């Protein structure tokens, strides 16, 4: 089945002498692993599409009994260049991608989480919002989508006792 879907590149790594394997989070199929044959050849321009933090449009051949799917076409949908200007934003954005990659299973669609991830990365591209707040927001959204939403309304928080700190100048965070 031929699939045409937007996707965010989570991770890519070399495979063999000239190929590349990319793990992408797509809107329709969730996390998918794609093989890009010949992407590491000198004349190929496909490797640049599969760098983490790229928002791309992909067309690939999806086979139900396989873990790796062969890519046929790719194009940029959006390029968030301002994230790369700030090392702190890059580290938080890559951490978000790593969280997404490690927590979601393959071919498990989460369209609402995809939209949230896209909006969070777009917000990282703008300089108006605190990067830590965006990171925490995405963590809560991810937990909510996975069914582990914390109940922050309960003031007692059972099982959690915080120590009394008299002088917080000696605390290391």
What are the functions of these language-model segments?
Residues 1-20, 25-173:
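Non-catalytic alpha-helical scaffolds and adjoining flexible linkers that form interface surfaces
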